[in-house]
Regions:
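Broad gene-expression machinery/nucleic-acid interaction feature
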Residues: 13, 35-37, 138
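Transmembrane beta-strands of outer-membrane beta-barrel proteins
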Residues: 13-19, 55-61, 114-116, 142, ...
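Outer-membrane beta-barrel transmembrane domain signature
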Residues: 25-112, 116-125, 130, 161
């Protein structure tokens, strides 16, 4: 679901992604479960620098029982003093705030920066001995480069966010 401002410089979106989660030890791949992370996001183009795009989003995160087991379950055979057996449950994982800022430097090169703040207070598995912290912060930076651009291009009436 998306709302756009009249001049097309701002949009508000509600995203409802469901993602499958897999792990690998490079000899096999295993399905671990899924994550449902709805997010309400505000995006703005041309904020600060021409052609830039700023985005901030907020939403809860929920995970399946299989995925929660992968992260938080402690089987009886691995329990020890200070780390009792624990059977994880599906449900609320936490609240996520994400933000990013992207600036195209040329037609082929863009620079971006962003981050994520996560609050796991009230998570369904906060009682697990493997649950370490209620807060998590991540910062990222990146440089993207288009290796090839087709000389055949079509006209487009797309908005800056498309």
């Amino acid at each position: 679901v998306t709302w756009r401002s009249a001049p097309g410089t701002t949009r508000l979106t509600l995203e409802t992604p469901v993602r499958a989660v897999f792990s690998t030890d490079f000899s096999s791949v295993k399905y671990r479960g899924y994550v449902f992370a709805p997010e309400l996001a505000l995006e703005r183009s041309g904020l600060g620098l021409p052609r830039s795009r700023a985005r901030i989003g907020l939403g809860p995160v929920f995970a399946s029982g299989g995925l929660m087991d992968y992260w938080y379950r402690v089987e009886e055979r691995y329990s020890r003093p200070g780390r009792p057996a624990y059977d994880a449950a599906s449900g609320y994982l936490g609240l996520r705030l994400q933000f990013s800022y992207r600036v195209p430097l040329t037609e082929r090169i863009s620079v971006s920066a962003g981050g994520r703040l996560e609050n796991f207070s009230g998570a369904s598995n906060a009682g697990s001995p493997l649950f370490r912290s209620e807060l998590n912060a991540t910062l990222v930076g990146g440089l993207s480069f288009a290796l090839y651009r087709s000389p055949a291009q079509t006209g487009s009436a797309a908005e800056p966010f498309d």
